Amino acid sequence: MIWYLCLSNCQFSLQCFSCYFLEGFIMISSTNFIYLALLPPLLAPIFIFIFKNNQNLRDSVGLIGSLISFYATINITNDLMNGGSPNLYLFNIFSDLSLSFKVTPLGAVFGLLCSGLWILAAIYSIGYMRGNNEKNQTRFYIFYSLSIFGALCVAWSSNLLVLFIFYEFLTFATYPLVVHKETDESIKASRL
């Protein structure tokens, strides 16, 4: 019966199995994919802090978040390439100025780079941080995740005010990464 319903609705498309189960649910739009791309790096620090005493869980939060964010960014880029205009409106600041995000072709490329490299860097940083017995690994992962959030927001900012806000956010989020080792050299480098 499931296949009969699907065959009549989809005519043998790859969505046959999912159309039966997803019927009546909200389909994921490009706006929801922007949420899906931005929420993992924003929420991951909370879970990283919660799991700070369990290295495996703490480190897997960053990796899972990077995979979700990359998946959403691929779908956003796909929507843009198919003629869509992915955007996310949050609220008005002034009458003509809003806190919103709009994905442009260059922003989509930058978003793919950020979220794609986040996966590789997350895998590498787990081995590097554990192999060198680095201190404050939880702090590193929290601010690394927030930096990815800031970079995606900069890439998809819809106006100069949003760009400025999240560029400054990115500046403050990367500062603890620069001074992570807390040596005189790293503190001196952070002052530049």
Please give the residue ranges for each predicted region.
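Cysteine-centered motifs
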Residues: 6, 10, 16-19
